Amino acid sequence: MESANASTSAQSIDQLCKECNIPMHNLQILCVFCRKTLSTAEVYSFAYKQLYVVYRGNFPFAACAICLELQGKVNQFRHFNYAGYAVTVEEETNKSILDVLIRCYLCHKPLCHVEKVRHILDKARFIKLQDTWKGRCFHCWTSCMETILP
């Protein structure tokens, strides 16, 4: 990251840019996993996905696209609890499926209402990883299905 104040308490890319007075397209931040500098597109993607900046030694880090997907797959294998339909999620959380924060288990983007409804209409299950419900966003759903279909 370029000339940023390491004492910031920013939790998001947007907050970090505001507190450090750096335009988002000029932000240089390292991936917490591989230590490579995120591209401008990855910085914007990280912000769009509403992911949190993490701190190591008072220095902010994000995660690149490749590491996010890899971590998603690792979490799926290591921390899978069980799968359930929307009804199961609603019963467990005592909330409407539309009010539950559900992220994509691959790219970690929060699912919108339409993506949650697609799970219901297609009778697709949500998965519970480490006590958190996950699903698939449209982008990851399509890329997942492309590998299955001829």
Swiss-Prot record:
Gene3D superfamilies: E6 early regulatory protein (3.30.240.40)
Pfam families reported for this sequence: E6
Record's keyword terms, sorted: Activator, DNA-binding, Early protein, Host cytoplasm, Host nucleus, Host-virus interaction, Inhibition of host innate immune response by virus, Metal-binding, Modulation of host cell apoptosis by virus, Transcription, Transcription regulation, Viral immunoevasion, Zinc, Zinc-finger
Chief location category: host cell
GO biological process, one term: regulation of DNA-templated transcription
UniProt-listed InterPro entries: E6, E6_sf
One GO CC term, this protein: host cell nucleus
Origin: domain of life: Viruses
Function field: This protein may be involved in the oncogenic potential of this virus (cervical neoplasia-associated virus).
Similarity field: Belongs to the papillomaviridae E6 protein family.
HAMAP family: HPV_E6 (MF_04006)
Protein name: Protein E6
Organism: Human papillomavirus 44
